[in-house]
A protein has these predicted regions:
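Phosphate-coordinating catalytic segments in nucleotide- and nucleic-acid-processing enzymes
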Residues: 5-7, 48-325, 394-429
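Switch/communication elements of ASCE P-loop NTPase nucleotide-binding domains
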Residues: 1-51, 290-427
Length: 429
């Protein structure tokens, strides 16, 4: 089992943090100490490392779509100034189909192929347009504006060829640059994919190998997916159809295949839920439904928020996304949970690490969650892979925090006991 160390320093509230990720890791500390910053930064870092080629393709396909946008303006001119009876010759339906394919595809090779086909269609279209239009001078003027050129045209055919050759070159250069970026893996490209995050003091190592150096970055080998969610924003994920997390809840993993041992946890979660979570069709799309064992059926977004917390884990497991090569990051998993259910949730997290091997990072400031994980991890024999970190204010700046690894949870509970002291203080006569 690979071991990971995640470090971040001098960033927002974080003075220094060096976090082991070799099992189940808990970040504890007061509000504003940087726990969520650590979680979100790790998510974005790991997402770039695990999905680098897909992210490069996504950016490049977006750039290709932007490069062909002027062709939509050409459509407007042609529809206005070329006789409508000629439009059937211009294969408008095929053109619209190609545009839609470019807009939807996430594959760079396909986007380049569709774009070059589209350009060829427009080359034919404009060549014929100049032959049939009665407004040739006006058409020339409009096209020069669309393509932002002041070039004097020796003839219409040369102008059309020049414009589309330049567009073809632009498409090919976008694809060529993307392919080279995949090979080079330069630090600058990495920085571009993590906007608004200072990575100068950021590092992740895998089995002792640092993945970021001065000029390049290396691949993660044994982490293939990262999943991150904030429990206090549970309801938002059910409506965000563009997010990765939404797809994890609704779609089965392409590599879906569960071992017998991996089936045990979903069964345990069904027992806790008292039912199942299934997809259902509605007029405007789909939704998740909670089917209770006594026959009750309601949309999941109308269920208790605590039940939704467990439902998310159930869906991630059943859809095949929580594996030994997954990093799961959860902010404040105890949010919305009754103390009894906090203990159950802690047990699921410990068993998820023990039985499946998923690496887990959570942030928490709840004593029940911390104590439950500590006790259950010891009982299940995984305490050596359970790491507790506590954020302490820096000696030089009370607004900057150092995350220190704890041999036991005593220091964490000392911080929780401050609340009891305050209660006594404010409650005294």
């Amino acid at each position: 089992m690979s071991r990971y160390v995640y470090s971040l320093s001098d960033y927002r509230a974080i003075k220094k943090a060096e976090i082991a990720l070799d099992g189940l890791t808990i970040l504890a500390g007061e509000n504003g100490s940087g726990k969520s910053t650590l979680s979100e930064t790790l998510y974005r870092l790991t997402k770039v490392l695990t999905e680098y080629e897909q992210l490069i393709d996504k950016k490049a396909t977006g750039d290709i779509y932007s490069a062909i946008r002027p062709l939509q303006k050409v459509d407007m001119v042609l529809q206005r100034y070329v006789h409508r009876e000629q439009n059937s010759d211009f294969q408008i339906e095929e053109i619209l189909h190609l545009v839609e394919k470019i807009r939807e595809t996430k594959n760079l090779i396909s986007a380049e192929e569709y774009a070059l086909k589209l350009i060829e269609k427009y080359r034919e279209l404009l060549t014929k347009a100049f032959e049939v239009t009665r407004n040739k001078e006006f058409l020339r003027s409009r096209l020069m504006t669309i393509f932002e050129t002041e070039q004097e045209m020796s003839d219409d055919k040369s102008f059309v060829e020049n414009v589309f050759s330049k567009m073809e070159d632009e498409i090919e250069n976008i694809a060529k640059t993307a392919r080279q970026d995949k090979i080079d893996r330069k630090r600058k490209t990495f920085v571009d994919l993590m906007p608004r995050i200072d990575i100068s003091n950021l590092q992740l190592s895998e089995d002792g190998v640092e993945l970021l150096d001065q000029n390049h970055f290396n691949q993660l080998i044994n982490i293939k997916r990262v999943i991150y969610y904030k429990t206090y924003e549970l309801m938002d994920y059910l409506g965000d159809k563009l997010s990765d997390f939404y797809s994890y809840l609704f779609e089965t993993s392409p590599e879906y295949q569960m071992t017998q041992e991996e089936r045990l946890l979903p069964m345990r979660l069904r027992s806790i839920l008292g039912g199942t979570i299934d997809r259902g069709e509605i007029l405007w799309g789909e939704q998740l439904l909670y089917h209770r064992d006594d026959g009750l059926e309601i949309p999941l977004n109308q269920a208790a928020t605590g039940l939704i917390s467990f439902s998310y884990l159930a869906r991630l497991l059943e859809n095949g996304y929580l594996k030994k090569d997954t990093l799961l990051i959860i902010d404040e998993p105890e949010a919305h949970l009754h103390p009894k259910w906090i203990v159950e949730y802690a047990r699921i997290l410990v068993l998820l690490q023990k039985q499946i091997g998923t690496k887990i990072l959570i942030s928490s400031h709840n004593p029940d969650m911390v104590a439950a994980i500590d006790a259950i991890a010891r009982k299940e024999g995984v305490s050596e892979r359970t790491n507790f970190y506590f954020a302490k204010p820096s000696d030089t700046n009370k607004y900057k925090y150092i995350f220190e690894r704890q041999d036991n949870i005593g220091s964490i509970f000392d911080s929780f006991n401050i609340a009891l002291t305050r209660i006594e203080e404010y409650g005294e006569d």
